Swiss-Prot record:
GO molecular function, one term: methylenetetrahydrofolate dehydrogenase (NADP+) activity
Catalysed reactions, as listed in the record: (6R)-5,10-methylene-5,6,7,8-tetrahydrofolate + NADP(+) = (6R)-5,10-methenyltetrahydrofolate + NADPH; (6R)-5,10-methenyltetrahydrofolate + H2O = (6R)-10-formyltetrahydrofolate + H(+)
Record: residues binding NADP(+): G167, R168, S169, S192
Protein name: Bifunctional protein FolD
Function: Catalyzes the oxidation of 5,10-methylenetetrahydrofolate to 5,10-methenyltetrahydrofolate and then the hydrolysis of 5,10-methenyltetrahydrofolate to 10-formyltetrahydrofolate.
Pathway it works in: One-carbon metabolism; tetrahydrofolate interconversion
Family label: Belongs to the tetrahydrofolate dehydrogenase/cyclohydrolase family.
Protein's gene: folD
Subunit structure: Homodimer.
Amino acid sequence: MTQLIDGFRIAAGICESIATSVAHLRKNNGLVPSLRVIIVGENPASQVYVRSKQKKAESLGIDAETIALPKDTSEVELIRLVNSLNDDTSINAILVQLPLPPHINPTRIIESIDSKKDVDCFHPENVGRLALSKDALLKPCTPAGSLYLIKSALGDNLSGMDAVVIGRSNIVGKPMAMLLLHENCTITLTHSKTRNIQEKTRQADIVISAVGIPHFVKKDFIKPGATVIDVGMNKVDGKLVGDVDFEDVLQKVKFITPVPRGVGPMTIAFLMLNTVITTCLQNKLEHQEVIGTVIQKL
């Protein structure tokens, strides 16, 4: 029987732990984690995401502020702002909402963020730490949230399982593969140039799709009893749908995340978690004592 992995419910539980951690920092250390989100331009989807992040942060007791800049903001001006936030010791976490306008190089912006305040975990130092060790303190939000969902369904021991990641982006695909490799899974990372993707996915115990194509994954991609994590968020006829054709694969899988209420809430929860971790790092506090129950699954 197919079971839904309810990311909304699981994320709510994580956020309860984070709220407790924030209260702990305030009471015992006199600290309030602070997050600054920068958005450039008026991309409607980005505005929705930023509002969701700020609302969630505020609900957990985090000091959150969105800095909205006009779309003609120059790259130099944006880097200057990031540097000012880097230098401000009262700011613990910095996020620059992507995508940026075409005239701004996102790589330069990401590299300008202090790696200890990089809650997206996109900075090359944090990417390198993730590649080197399972014990990297900061992990990218969507892949880390997806891994948490996988473990919630299958248990903490994923050793020996075959996993296929569809999509090789720096944001989801590559770090997702790295996290699963640290769990001793055997990884196949597929992409737009991969031949016969279905042949790869049909061998997998775990399939993670982050390709951004509505209903790309059909039942002929999936072996019976597989676990499917749908990272895709696509608009079709005004409705939010995933990369996975949910109804088509539903009777074939053992576990699956819905869209919405799957990976999306986990991404925001792990952004909040990273904000608490960066606060602990900058203040030389033992983060595991503050948020140990969440960290155990990572």
